[in-house]
């Protein structure tokens, strides 16, 4: 199937039906790079008037995820027209996922991940500042805090986090991920007082958190920071607390829910 579709594509056929089937086949074959290149070659050549069709929307929805790409920028620029062909809820959902994916790539970047793309970061911030969706303030707060982490300015990071919580910019439980990702950056901080500040904040949040799996995750973070500060006894105690909260979470769910396993 894939080889037949490839031959037709290479022979110059470009109907949306062929493209849709070819891109699906590439996706099934885990050929993401080729899939992205094929989608981009077709979609990037379309004008605003040409791109606004149901078929093209389906191609964008399934094959384009970068909010800075030309097709998604065209969706944003012609949002009302795309709402008409695809429905507001569907279009907004796609945009939110695309933007959050791009934000996560930046916020989870650490110094061992190769060179940081400053230009892309600046472009993304500029795009977000021009949009008005409920999730945008949280996304921007994440990008602003991430800059302090990259610079190793941990005091600035803590202040940035406090600012974000003061204005209550997160929704749907996103603040938990934001808090944990950033507070754990203190494991790279050599100022023991600042690391302890992070530990104390974790304790405060844990006391305010009702979800037992979330409490377990916070204790995992606490153990990492106490280890950084050389408090092995405290770290062991935090790990025991983590296990206790995890067991309670499983018990309360009747064994139906399990906590996501960390890979690091």
Predicted feature residues:
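Oxidative protein folding and maturation machinery
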Residues: 1-264
